[in-house]
């Protein structure tokens, strides 16, 4: 396969990470930490890794989380600028922090003007549930509404997070039931499938709401069918992702090869690795109305 898209990798301004967060990120990567740091500065280094791994495109996950992770709003400009090195292969993601924004609608518009292709909401790292607009966080509802109006997909982290200060109680995918009902034309990507505590909830949301897609990043590929034994039923809405180089994810290609060893039909493998991402990020339309 020559058109593999990994919709979930972390190329971010890691120099903004809080010291305790950076320590957790660095664990297990000591022997190649400097290479990873250089990759955050140099898109050519990432493209070389992608070429070796036979990965065509990647989604560059970025979002503000100043109080928990350390990332400020400049992470959006970082992603947009980084992706300019190869707009065909590098897809920039950004975020608007619902607890801190003073102009949620305008901030979404400004990200689109920057070239951001997807908004990332990270409940455990931003300290609110994905449906917090139902309980007073009006800015979050305005973010969803503007993304719905502009056709901008929204990725929501589901499941736990190991980083210091992360609020894993906000990672339950069931909160997306409200979002999918209240914003029926919003394209939602459910990152990580609720791993490891909320897999059944994630599958329920996926089956109930056609506009929700599942991103399998952060799930060991060899356990994917153990966690989601009925994956083939929703195979047209499953997106390939690795979460690389987050803790526990060593290699882009290794994960792909482990996935290809699963007892899935070739057409299902192709849909997950290639076709479904092309429907979300079509090459002929990388801008939004």
Predicted segment positions?
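Generic structural signal for well-ordered alpha-helices
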Residues: 43-47, 76-83, 108-109, 140, ...
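Catalytic pocket-lining loop regions of alpha/beta-barrel enzymes
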Residues: 117-118, 132-240
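Short aromatic-enriched loop/helix-cap "lid" or pocket-rim segments at secondary-structure transitions
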Residues: 15-21, 105-107, 131-133, 166-168, ...
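Conserved, mostly hydrophobic/aromatic
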Residues: 8, 50, 79, 111, ...
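Active-site environment of divalent metal-dependent phosphoester hydrolases
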Residues: 12-15, 65-68, 98-102, 126-128, ...
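Mid-to-C-terminal alpha-helical segments outside catalytic/metal-binding sites
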Residues: 2-10, 14-57, 234-237, 247-289
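Active-site neighborhood of phospho(di)ester-bond hydrolases with catalytic His/Asp-centered motifs
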Residues: 4-7, 60-61, 93-95, 188-191, ...
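Active-site gating/metal-coordination segments in enzymes
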Residues: 56-57, 65-162, 208
């Amino acid at each position: 396969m020559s058109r593999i898209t990994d919709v979930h990798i972390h190329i971010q301004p890691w120099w903004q990470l809080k010291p305790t967060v950076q320590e957790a990120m660095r664990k297990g990567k000591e022997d190649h930490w400097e290479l990873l740091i250089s990759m955050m500065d140099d898109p050519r280094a990432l493209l070389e890794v992608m070429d070796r791994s036979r990965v065509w495109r990647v989604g560059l996950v970025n979002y503000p989380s100043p109080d928990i992770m350390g990332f400020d709003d400049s992470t959006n400009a970082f992603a947009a600028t980084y992706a300019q090195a190869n707009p065909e292969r590098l897809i920039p993601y950004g975020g608007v922090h619902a607890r801190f924004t003073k102009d949620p609608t305008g901030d979404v518009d400004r990200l689109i003007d920057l070239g951001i292709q997807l908004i990332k909401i990270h409940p455990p790292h931003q300290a609110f549930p994905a449906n917090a607009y139902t309980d007073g966080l009006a800015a979050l509802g305005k973010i969803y509404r503007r993304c719905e109006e502009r056709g901008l997909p929204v990725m929501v982290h589901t499941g736990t997070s190991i980083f210091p200060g992360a609020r894993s109680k906000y990672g339950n995918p069931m909160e997306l039931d409200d979002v999918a009902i209240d914003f029926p034309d919003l394209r939602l990507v459910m990152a990580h499938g609720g791993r490891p505590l909320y897999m059944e909830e994630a599958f329920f949301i996926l089956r109930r709401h056609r506009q929700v897609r599942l991103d399998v990043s952060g799930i060991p590929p060899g356990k994917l069918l153990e966690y989601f034994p009925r994956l083939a039923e929703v195979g047209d809405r499953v997106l390939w992702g690795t979460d690389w180089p987050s803790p526990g994810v060593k290699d882009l290609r290794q994960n792909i090869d482990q996935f290809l060893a699963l007892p899935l039909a070739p057409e299902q493998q192709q849909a997950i690795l290639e076709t479904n991402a092309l429907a979300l990020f079509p090459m002929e339309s990388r801008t939004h109305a």
